[in-house]
Amino acid sequence: MGQVFLLMPVLLVSCFLSQGAAIENQRLFNIAVSRVQHLHLLAQKMFNDFDGTLLPDERRQLNKIFLLDFCNSDSIVSPVDKHETQKSSVLKLLHISFRLIESWEYPSQTLIISNSLMVRNANQISEKLSDLKVGINLLITGSQDAYMSLDDNDSQQLPPYGNYYQNLGGDGNVRRNYELLACFKKDMHKVETYLTVAKCRKSLEANCTL
């Protein structure tokens, strides 16, 4: 009986520590989701602002090219639809989100150089990407099952971004900016979706459907 009473304080402390860790985890998730939502909104605004400077025929042609083309980050293996996203583990969604954010660290800098209309937003984006990357890394490190072996596809390096647009031709600058912004918007939407689902799972909500 005495041993039971001795164990009770230990169990209570353990319970409080566990609750504290869960609260901190949710706080980090809230911050990460808020950051990526803001990034997604900035990406949409930058794309819409640039799209608004194009002539109708130019816009249609670039949209057709983009639909047939691919983004540099497409080499990162990620869920292809809502169903696959729902089936993915929290840790897998965090790892994919981290790699997607990491893949934009250099390209976000090129936006500052390539289009003077977007300098202010691009500066915001570079800083917010760095903050979000740190936050996602904390979530990965603090995960209860933080060990996850990456398969060959996950561990592959992205192709050098500098070579991605080397064969665009005479209209390369306009097409380059269009594809950069369209891909950035697409990837921020992905990360927002993945982090929102991961946050919901960690909060133990009954319904985490997209």
From Swiss-Prot:
Annotated transmembrane regions: none
Main location: secreted
Taxonomy, superkingdom: Eukaryota
S-S bonds: 71-183, 200-208
UniProt GO cellular component terms: extracellular space
UniProt cross-references to InterPro entries, sorted A to Z: 4_helix_cytokine-like_core, Somatotropin, Somatotropin/Prolactin, Somatotropin_CS
Signal peptide: 1-22
Protein's GO biological process: animal organ development; calcium ion homeostasis; growth hormone receptor signaling pathway; hyperosmotic salinity response; magnesium ion homeostasis; negative regulation of testosterone secretion; positive regulation of growth; positive regulation of phagocytosis
Binding site residues for Zn(2+): 38, 192
The keyword Glycosyltransferase appears for this protein: no
One example GO MF annotation: metal ion binding
SUPFAM superfamilies xref list: 4-helical cytokines
Protein location: Secreted
Record keywords: Disulfide bond, Hormone, Metal-binding, Secreted, Signal, Zinc
Family: Belongs to the somatotropin/prolactin family.
PANTHER family according to UniProt: SOMATOTROPIN, SOMATOTROPIN,PROLACTIN
Function description: Growth hormone plays an important role in growth control and is involved in the regulation of several anabolic processes. Implicated as an osmoregulatory substance important for seawater adaptation.
Annotated protein name in UniProt: Somatotropin
Naturally occurring in which organism (per UniProt): Oncorhynchus tshawytscha (Chinook salmon)
